[in-house]
Structure formats: C-alpha cells, structure tokens
Amino acid sequence: MLILVSPAKTLDFEQPPLTQVYSQPDFLTHSQELIQVCRQLTPSDIATLMKVSDKIAGLNAARFGEWQPDFSLDNAKQAIFAFRGDVYTGFDADSLSEDEIAQTQSQLRILSGLYGLLRPLDLIMPYRLEMGTALSNPKGKNLYEFWGDTLTQAVNEALAESGSDIIVNLASNEYFKAIKPKKLQGQLISPVFKDCKNGQYKVISFFAKRARGMMARYIITNKVNTLAELKAFNLAGYYYSEEQSSPTNPTFLREEQ
C-alpha cells in the first residue's frame, strides 16, 4: 500500500531528529521556482494571500529569504520529524523503530505545496505554503496549475516501486486536489472517520486528522497489504462500519468521547 498524507502548518526544528539517515526531495528545482515567486511578496502580500497575522507573514517572508537548496542536517530536518500537528500526533513517528522508519520511506508520501511530494526522510527547510494558496506563478494562477500532472506521475512511480496497487488517501481534500485520480495507476481508497456527536455520526476535523495519522501508522506497523486488513483498524475506539462504507470509502465510526 502507498499512503498519502498532508503536511502540517506546525513545524519542529528544535528537537534533534531520531536518525541521521536522510534523503533529498525530488522536486527541489520546482521548489526553487516557487521560492523565487514568493521572494517577490512583501510581508503584507503574504498576510493577505495566506490569511495569516502580520507576525506569521513576517516569519514566512524571512523563511523564503533564507531558503536555499543545499540541504544538510545542519540547516534542515527530515519531513516526518519536522511536521507536527494532529496527523503527526496520530502517526507518532518518534516512537517508530528503525525498521519501521525505513518502511515509511517506501510506503508513505507527504503532499506539499512547496516540495511537491516528499518521502518521510527527505530533508526540508522551514516553510509555509499551503497547496490551496492562490499563488500566481509562471505555470498558472495557483499551485494546482503549477504542479499539473507532476505529482500524479510521482505517485504512480512510487506505487510501482512499492509493489502494491492500492493507494490509501489519508490527505485532506485541499492537498489531494493536486492529484488527478483518473490518471492514477492503482486502486484508490479514501478512508472516512466519523465521531458520534449528539446521536449523529459526523466528520469532526480534529479527530479525523488524528485518526488519519493513526491509520497511516497502523498500516506501517501491522504490515497491512489488503483492504480486508485495513478494515481491521481499531485504534482509539474506531471500528469499521459496513453500513456506512462504500467500495472506495471505507468508513470508521467512534462513539461519543
């Protein structure tokens, strides 16, 4: 199985990584193109474009200015340890074994507005550039047009290398929109997580994000290879619901917390 997840806005570049093993992102030339565009933006432009505070806009203007593509462990960090946030809390990479971290390198891919498609051990420098940002660039009016078919092709290549034909989409809609499902050369599965609130099952963003991270970890640590094995996911009180599921959207429910 090849797993797709979103990145996180929250970053941790303070704690040292748990391994000295790393790889370099595949699309740094593309990243450099975007950085050149972003460097034309004033902090005020960034605040408006990204809908962030002046403080965060200033921070990211500085990050764009400092960014350079010669990554090492001195100035960058592996993506799986740099990203924090709900999905990554659920995934809990810090407690994986060395073998499991190695497994994530072939089985997990992180969609990114700046870096395109990251392997877990790819080095990144701090940034904020969400996939849904309407950043005008030489290839179009937003990042979806910038990346075009590039990320879909990269997912197909990663899928072929993984030896599986199942893609488990645990990314948000914003990020998965960068992929063209009809061009994927495998079976696409997009799990849904619903929590019971006031007697009704619904997707609650905070819980769903954590559940996505937990499922990504579950696939890695349990060596899940089939849809039947995926349906056995039962962490944090979730259970598979045949009634609420469709062939491409296995649905997991949890009672009120």
Curated annotation (Swiss-Prot):
Signal peptide: none annotated. InterPro entries: YaaA. GO terms for cellular component: cytosol. Pfam families: H2O2_YaaD. GO terms for biological process: response to hydroperoxide. Belongs to the UPF0246 family. This is UPF0246 protein Sbal223_3241.
